[in-house]
Amino acid sequence: MTGLVDQQELEKRLATEEDSQNEDIENQLPSIETIINTYREKENRRVNLRFKAIGRTPLLRKTVFSINASQRFEKVTRFLKKELGLPMNSSLVLYVNSSFAPSPDEIVGNLYDNFAIDSHLLINYCINVAFG
């Protein structure tokens, strides 16, 4: 009889410990509302872009613009062509921090998060390929 009581007691303790562990895990996870609010903030976030011409490329009168962080980089290219008065089928090469040319489907917010300097993402632009 003692063995049966000990086993029942042990099962109760294990069940209690498991319940407390589950509660701890639930307390560590963010609520659905928190997750949704974080997503909405990222969707509505705007980032600053600073444009700088390379070589004989036309200059912009205003060099700092703001864009929604969820936009793809191709939107930046189209916007800049429009601002410079270039035809949409013309060549325009954009570089981030004079280092690399991002893919048109890259998300602007990701570039900003990884390469922004002084709260601006520096975009160098030119009509011809400037760097290898």
Swiss-Prot record:
Keywords: Autophagy, Cytoplasm, Isopeptide bond, Membrane, Nucleus, Protein transport, Transport, Ubl conjugation pathway. GO terms for cellular component: Atg12-Atg5-Atg16 complex; autophagosome membrane; cytosol; nucleus; phagophore assembly site membrane. The keyword Protein transport applies. Signal peptide: none annotated. Disruption phenotype: Impairs atg8-processing. There is a cross-link at G132 (Glycyl lysine isopeptide (Gly-Lys) (interchain with K-148 in ATG5)). Ubiquitin-like protein involved in cytoplasm to vacuole transport (Cvt), autophagy vesicles formation, mitophagy, and nucleophagy. Conjugation with atg5 through a ubiquitin-like conjugating system involving also atg7 as an E1-like activating enzyme and atg10 as an E2-like conjugating enzyme, is essential for its function. The atg12-atg5 conjugate functions as an E3-like enzyme which is required for lipidation of atg8 and atg8 association to the vesicle membranes. Plays a role in meiosis and sporulation. This is Ubiquitin-like protein ATG12. The gene is atg12.
